[in-house]
Amino acid sequence: MEPAEEPGQISKDNFLEVPNLSDSVCEDEEVKATFKPGFSPQPSRRGSGSSEDMYLDTPTSASRRVSFADSLGFSLVSVKEFDCWELPSVSTDFDLSGDVFHTDEYVLSPLFDLPSSKEKLMEQLQVQKAVLESAEHLPGSSMKGIIRVLNISFEKLVYVRMSLDDWQTHYDILAEYVPNSCDGETDQFSFKISLVPPYQKEGGKVEFCIRYETSAGTFWSNNNGTNYILVCQKKRKEPEPVKPLEEAPSRQIKGCLKVKSRSKEEPLLAPEENKFETLKFTESYIPTIICSHEDKDDLGANHPNVDDINKKHDEHNGKELDLMINQRLITSQDEKNTFATDTVNFTNKAEGSEKKQAYHEINTDLFMGPLSPSLSAESSLKRDFYHSRSSSPGNEYGHPHSEEIISDMGEKGPSLGDTSSDELMQLELCSKEDLDDNANPANGSGRVCSSFDQRMACGLKNNEAGIKKTGIQDYKYSHGDSTKLEESNASSRDDYAKVDNKKEKQTCLGVNENPSKNFQSVFQTQEGHMGYPKISTEGDKANNQDLTSLLSKDITANTWAVTVDPCPSTNAKRSWREVGSGSNLEPGTSDLSSPRNFSPLTDDHLFQADRENSDSSNPENQNMNTRHRKKWNVLETQSETSETESDIAKHTKEQAEYKDMWEKTDNSRNLKATPTEHLFTCRETECYGLSSLADHGITEKAQAVTAYIIKTTLESTPESASARGKAIIAKLPQETAGNDRPIEVKETAFDPHEGRKDDSHYSLCHGDTAGVIHDNDFERESHLDICNLRVDEMKKEKTTSTCFPQKTYDKEKHGIGSVTSIDEPSQVITGNQKATSKLDLHLGVLPTDRAIFQANADLELLQELSRRTDFNAVPSAFNSDTASASRDSSQVYRHCSKKSVPSYGEEKAVTNTTLQSIPTKSEYNWHPESEVLGHAMSKPEDVFKSSEIMKSGSGGERGGGPILQQKEGSLENSQGPMFFTNEPLENLDEASSENEGLMHSGQSQCYLGDKGLVSSASATVSTQELEAQGRESLLSISTNSKIPYFLLFLIFLATVYYYDLMIGLAFYLFSLYWLYWEGGRQRESVKKK
């Protein structure tokens, strides 16, 4: 035992040694607490007591002070500013691979041999009792070995004794038993030897032997007395094999732009026919650029003057290459279009030969691949235009003109492919002026516009000379081809090519024609190159080929052919404008297109006719083109329509013929609809286009027509004694427009089928202010009560007043007068709808559109809102039998009259008619006994006369009917068709015993004469029926009044849950008081009425 030492005296030698256990009792306790067996861990408990003791040991000083900077007059916060350039710029891109230092890796190499077979292994086992069976070298300086021992006894231990310094010191490693390795005779144990960095060096040697301890004795295995030796060696990295660089072929090195090689035996000069075939324009064509020194050498050998030609066209070829790249970009975008591109056909032999020659000259420098066909034609035509302008006047106004436009497009590079609508493609052509005589206003050449709409207008304005010479012939071609287009899309492409060939021949050969005639072929040639949908604008007839080819609709070439577009196309704006702006060369023939949306609520034919006249005979009116923008928001679909208006002096004779045809087609029928049918509703309104008559010297004043439109709907069955109805009044604006002031028309459409349970749908068009008639009279007398409710009255009636401010776009160009903005509210009366309610006034208001059109003009656009019916059927339509089942069914009479302009160009009035209303039974127990059928007639004079509605007395006249008198004009002067729609509404579930008390509607008589239209109706209501209606109305009102209280109670509960009880109770009491006060006001207003 070593002598005892003091606890504080620890020498340098025994610094890392374990202290002597016999030094003192205190040290003994500390050692026992510090050194504990690893197999008996005891959890250390961190109680609160130890932490408290630790904090209690910390001395506290009561004399410490805390002072703040603000008490000393300093600021609490000190800010130090650093300049950004003083900060060192530290890059965030850390290359960890370069920073990591590479350490040398060492491995253990064995210097012993293992048993090669199991027999040798068993022989050694019988002698040595333990043998190293296998050794596995792990990554790094580690080795894992397997020891096979002879199963002598059950209890056994295997050690591996190793030494690093030739057995001066050694370590024993306990080997672990390998599970499930016992085969009855032998067992397996595993061990692992690893070298750490102090001993990990080159040439380090590890020696080990095996000691096998059993109950029978201890056995050693040392590799026959030589021990098992492992040598530490540095791991050698095998160099990565460097792949040899493959030499590229000399041809590939010389020609960097070379894509494919071409044999030298290929003839350098192809025949002219083959070269002309390369001009064919295909969708999937990709130009190939091949340029190599070998090919240039061959080319120079065959053509000694190649260098001279290259020097001559060096600058030109650079420009052509830029144009080709831009053209390729545009072509790749245009390949997405659904229209196939046709072959470019040249009609002039001399021109074709010049193109071939120019094509050969272009390809002399880049000969090994053809240029883009569109580029070849474009460049040749452009060069012909520059060099041969004086010698070829036909080409001057023909193809070079169009190619200049395409060249401008190629240089500016606009995005022209795959847009949602073709009319929105704004070609950047306005900024650059054409190179022909466009600057000369005397020639009247067409100006380049920024959109298809303006281009069509420009092509049609300056078209007078072309109309006189070849207009009718071109019309025949285009009209015939457009008819073929409607049948098949495949045949349409061929027809386009035919039309192009014929028209290009006429254009190129017609030298003396107006340049505007040839200006239109620009768009045809351009569309042929660029893959646009073909639009025939030759002559003065514009066919809607784009819309028909896209929608596959049939256009009948009769007087008023209509293309219905239930699913609006994106090309509608351009197509409708192109069609409508054409002049009608053949009387009685016109192709019309209607891009506007119609309500798909009817399964019968829809009718809408749009006509416009365009005449460019007077150069003063060429600047009178006004673009009117209208937004049609029907069923959340908007379509923009740009319009141009011009004078109508040339077409008054044709309109007179249209007048006769309208008189012939005015035969109509009275329609009776079943409850399952849908009432036709016009979801859009049409404006009356008025064009200028300034060139005729006629100064006329126009006054807007004021008309009342009343619609009522009754529904009843033979077994139900109740009826419910709807009354709608629309008042048209009354404005006075001067000679230079456009007339402003506001159009409002109502959607009343929100909340309706039946299949009836109504729409009210052409109204600035729409109100609902409320007749609260309980007397039996029959009287008229046509009124426009004020806003405060509607609030008392629990109604909603909706104001749609309208915005007028001021068109102050070319001398057109300004238009002031008029905001007129569209009032919609909304009533409560119940299962037993008699009045259904739940109306949805569609956005109100406003169209500005030119005053002093002809009425050209006519809208028909329903089916054409017979004028003679009016009395029978309004005479209802009291014994018939449909006596309470509503009869809606709508009429739009049109007066065609005679040859002297006078303005005629266009008016809207009113609707007849039949007695209804309301939720509030008031009955409009009879209502007015009003009709505003057209007048063959200069001033629009507003029709007057004569009202009978409120209570003085019993059984008296309303009389509508017209100042002037007669019904015969109106050329528009009449419309009658008759529809019974859904049945109400009431007892059939109430049939006896049913109010009997008298026969409504309509007198059609030259002076006016008279409608009268009378009915009687029994006192018992009124009382029954009152009880039912009170019951429904009381039911409705309980709903807000219940909702307020729920709000009260939620308030109490989230907030205080007193706050929720106060809110609830206040709400109850407010509801009671509002209910009292409503009762008082009802009593006053």
UniProtKB/Swiss-Prot annotation:
Superkingdom, taxonomy of origin? Eukaryota
Provide the free-text tissue specificity comment from this protein's UniProt record.
Answer: Skeletal muscle and heart.
Establish whether keyword Membrane is in the entry.
Answer: yes
Give the compositionally biased regions (Basic and acidic residues).
Answer: 602-614
The record's account of how the chain is modified after translation: Phosphorylation at Ser-48 by ISPK stimulates the dephosphorylation of glycogen synthase and phosphorylase kinase.
Q: Where is the composition biased (Gly residues)?
A: 953-962
**Domain CBM21 span(s) in chain numbering:** 123-231
Q: Which GO terms describe its molecular function?
A: protein serine/threonine phosphatase activity
List where the motif PP1-binding motif lies: 64-67
Where in the sequence is Phosphothreonine found?
A: T58
Q: Where in the cell is it found?
A: Membrane
UniProt domain comment = The CBM21 domain is known to be involved in the localization to glycogen and is characteristic of some regulatory subunit of phosphatase complexes.
Q: What is this protein called?
A: Protein phosphatase 1 regulatory subunit 3A
Gene of origin?
Ppp1r3a
